[in-house]
């Protein structure tokens, strides 16, 4: 199963619209009960009308990012037995990383594991207020343990400084703004073969523009109850998790209206969040490749990257690993989703359990030498 990002230019508004458009539904014909928007239909809609249709299309995308087990409109929910069959089918393709732990451990023998972790929905639960997305002390200890044995990076859409304050662990690599702002440990790190600090910022020239857009969005969203604008330095996130669904159209309208004045910025979408980013070719997959190179593992066969994430933006990293045929992507999700990940975990608590098992396995391996 493969996702495709269609970068569609709205000629009138000059907005780069990055929409994840599956070529087919989640399951093969005969099982396709999870609805996806056909690529051709979505492109036609975007081209047909440079104003209202664009907004309607984004509302569809916003609804699609709020997964449900019921069909849209007046179609009744799926029978429980059908849900179970579809979930079983999905799990057969993306089995639990806990169940398959021994397989993962076997694949890592003789190789250096490098761990990549998303933050929201992976290390911390998804919460209504993004400023209160704290990770538990148990999770912090699990990440600390992993970082003791393996190079570990936090790769997030958040501002790098903010997520570092959440995680509170030195010795990690932090990649904020979807990998556009990367900084490694300030001290020499035993995992870094090059023994030099890592600092990379892919879009410095966009900072004044991003700041201006952020301030405009704060003003525009002031009267929409529940809307939250977050300046993540190299991108801006507009959270609508707490916005009444009847106001989603107004959120999309404000965002696209402001963005029409900035052709060098594009609009993407995650879990109940719209994100404004520079139109550069950089994402979490590029960040993963950059960090592997910085760690001295470019084109190395002795490395096993593991990337754990829950959102659409993590798919770029999953695809890199799948295309390289090296390492594993692990999707955090309780429901079936199209993904390039190899394995799955249901929620952050399972992520913590997986990390702890990895630490215990490494400790046993060292004792057995």
Swiss-Prot record:
InterPro entries for this protein: HAD-like_sf, HAD-SF_hydro_IIB, HAD_sf, OTSB-like, Trehalose_PPase
Pfam families: Trehalose_PPase (PF02358)
Spans annotated as Disordered: 63-85
GO cellular component, one term: chloroplast
Cofactor(s) the record lists: a divalent metal cation
Listed pathway(s): Glycan biosynthesis; trehalose biosynthesis
UniProt-listed GO biological process terms: response to osmotic stress; response to oxidative stress; response to salt stress; trehalose biosynthetic process
Family: Belongs to the trehalose phosphatase family.
Protein name, as recorded: Probable trehalose-phosphate phosphatase D
